[in-house]
Amino acid sequence: MGSIGEPNRLLCWSIYVTKKPDQSEEDHHNHVSKVNAPMMIPFLKKYGIVRYTVKHNDAHSKPKQAALMAGQPEENVLAYDTVFEMIVKDIESIQTMQKDEEFLRTTIPDHFNFADMTRSKGSLTWIEEFTF
């Protein structure tokens, strides 16, 4: 799980996605849940991804987000429509999946069906969890 001397900890690869400009919010979220996620799951299992989470930001959650961020400058509020999270033991599992020919042929092209790929962003972090 990383270099020598690095603690054994899980990593989280987060991908922040904005829907395509010509796509409705409903179509975006339906495509993510009903087309893309089922397409991703076999690859996630094959390459040992520990957990996969899709977080939706829509007309119901956006006003609540605005209430939580009240008084903050608008640029401080993340305006992404969906956040994908892959929990992994090491980045090699994701890197290997990203080289899989079937994954490249099927899943990657599907991202262009629901995401404005020019605005997608990513972040790799490690996890510290507090359970209570």
Swiss-Prot record:
InterPro entries: Dimeric_a/b-barrel (IPR011008), EthD_dom (IPR009799)
Effect of a null allele: Abolishes the production of cercosporin but accumulates a red, cercosporin-like metabolite called precercosporin.
Pfam families the UniProt entry points to: EthD
EthD domain segment(s): 21-117
Keywords: Monooxygenase, Oxidoreductase
Highest taxon in the source lineage: Eukaryota
Transmembrane stretches, start-end: none
Catalytic class of the enzyme: oxidoreductase
Pathway(s) this gene product operates in, as recorded in its UniProt entry: Mycotoxin biosynthesis
GO molecular function: monooxygenase activity
EC number: 1.-.-.-
Recorded family membership: Belongs to the tpcK family.
Function: Dehydratase; part of the gene cluster that mediates the biosynthesis of cercosporin, a light-activated, non-host-selective toxin. The perylenequinone chromophore of cercosporin absorbs light energy to attain an electronically-activated triplet state and produces active oxygen species such as the hydroxyl radical, superoxide, hydrogen peroxide or singlet oxygen upon reaction with oxygen molecules. These reactive oxygen species cause damage to various cellular components including lipids, proteins and nucleic acids.
Name of this protein: Dehydratase CTB10
Organism field: Cercospora beticola
